[in-house]
Design a protein with these regions (language model features):
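Catalytic phosphate/metal-binding cores of nucleic-acid and nucleotide-processing enzymes, i.e., regions
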Residues: 67-70, 77
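Positively charged n-region of N-terminal signal peptides that target proteins for export
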Residues: 1-4
Length: 175
């Protein structure tokens, strides 16, 4: 009975969709486990890997639509067997000429347009949460909390904050 109740609670939370301002601990742990597996491939091939996070009919977290992208983009296919709650992707291998430690404007725009939230893992081992409704970014955990690219150099090309509004992100990429 307790398992069924827990599954129902997870399913109802997932159906709430992008209006969720935050995440729950079970989702965060599942995302870290999933993205840590993809980080290794991302660093090896210097490509983004992406997909969708959702909840199955049985109330379990699952992924779908996994895709290999390019150096700076990735386009997963939305699975029909999940109630999708968020997108997720890696930011490829470390490159001193890219702002890969912060989600891009394209990342935020894609989540907002798709009606989802998003999760982004960076070469420095950061994990970001994108609220697709408010277009705000929150640093869930800092450098090294996830698998990091051995070539990562801190603060290149510049220092990274712990939260950004969409306007702040626009200024960051403009400056």
């Amino acid at each position: 009975m307790a398992n069924r109740l827990a599954a129902l609670v997870l399913l109802l939370a997932a159906l709430a969709g992008p209006a969720r301002a935050e995440w729950n601990d079970a989702e965060r742990k599942f995302v870290i486990q999933t993205l840590n597996q993809l980080q290794k491939l991302s660093f090896k091939h210097h490509r983004e890997y992406c997909g969708f996070l959702g909840v199955t009919a049985h109330g379990k977290f699952a992924t779908g639509g996994l895709s290999q992208g390019t150096l700076d983009s990735c386009f997963p296919t939305k699975p029909d067997y999940l109630t999708v709650t968020a997108s997720f992707h890696t930011h490829g291998g470390f490159d001193s000429t890219h702002w890969s430690e912060v989600p891009s404007l394209q990342d935020v725009d894609s989540d907002a347009a798709g009606g989802t939230n998003g999760w982004v893992a960076t070469p420095g081992g950061r994990l970001w949460f994108i609220n697709g409704t408010t277009r705000t970014l929150t640093l869930v955990c800092g450098p090294g909390c996830m698998i990091s690219d051995p070539n990562y150099v801190p603060n290149v090309p510049g220092p990274v904050g712990s939260a950004y509004t969409y306007d702040e992100l626009q200024r960051l990429f403009r400056d």
